[in-house]
Amino acid sequence: MNRCRWVAGISSLALAFAFAPDAALAQAKSVKIRIQSVIPTSADEVTMLKEFAKDVEELTDKSVTFEVLPAGAVVAVNDTLDAVDKGLIEAGFAWTHYWSGKHPAATLFGSPPAGSGLGMDNFSWVSWYLYAGGKDLYDQLWKEMKVNIKGFMLQPVGPEALGWFKKPINSMADFRGRRFRTPPGIPGQIYKDIGVAAVAMGGGDILPALEKGVLDGAEWCCPKPDQVYGFQRVMKHYYLQGLHQVVVNADLYLNGDVWKKLTPHQQKAMEVAANASLMKTVAYRIHENGKALKELVEKDGVQLHDTPQEYFKQYSEATLKAFEKYSAENPFFKKVLDSQKAFAATAIPFWAQAQKSNASLGAAYAAQLAKKPAAKK
């Protein structure tokens, strides 16, 4: 046997031992985990949640299985985390910032506006989470909330668009003159801090409010979810660059007692599948949003605009000011933000410069596509 074949054989054997059901796994008790989502099971986030579940099932030889339940199946949406804590359901699925009422630091994990005011995007936030102390702080978050939860960060679903408008906005003065639906909580409050007439309302209420003239503009998410909501029917001016939810993360909450009863192999399988889900989600959403945006522009006549540059400075500065206030009031919030600041001071100067070439390359290609004549029918 030559050296290359010997090395390949050893590598294959090691991989088999790492992931094949061993004696301990074969003897493990079967566990069924019910996951109640806070959103309908038709949502893209649930599609990727089911992929995560499938990966865990395959890695554990189906000794761990899942049932994904729609919002409200067992308890009301707002009670999801408490229900998992008490063991009424084994797991829940939402965005971390849903629970900022229990602890403001949840915002720094689920939806830090303007990347915590530090310029973090989805990729750099995941870098902080995996390699700069973020995961340990995430685990501590549940202890700070005093809930019996083991959390798994699964899905970076941002960046979200600034939003839609009935008429173009060319300056912050224009923006301040529009009644604009924003996310609830801290991101929406920061809009108010910079003078925007921010209105918080549920997703199902947005389109009727636009049709009745109650709103002049709105944000929800990104091209595909926005398309599903039908915003293109009443608004044609779309601004993709926004800061209120440039980083948005969805995660899984597992009851702590259920977690402790899993074997080490089963626990590792969940951790491996969760890490894989981070990249798979980014890849999936780039493709889905790209397809939706193409349809919005070519079929629905939606016009894309660049967000006024003054917006970025004003929103970022207001975010930092708000976060300094929370830091003064809450030691754990400060601990998390200080960790993100230390990471950003090192990583963001590199990452921001490196992304310029990607942005220029993408813009150049988009410009080429725009010059091509439309295909004949």
Model-derived segments and their meaning:
Residues 131-146:
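Hinge/lid segment of periplasmic solute-binding proteins
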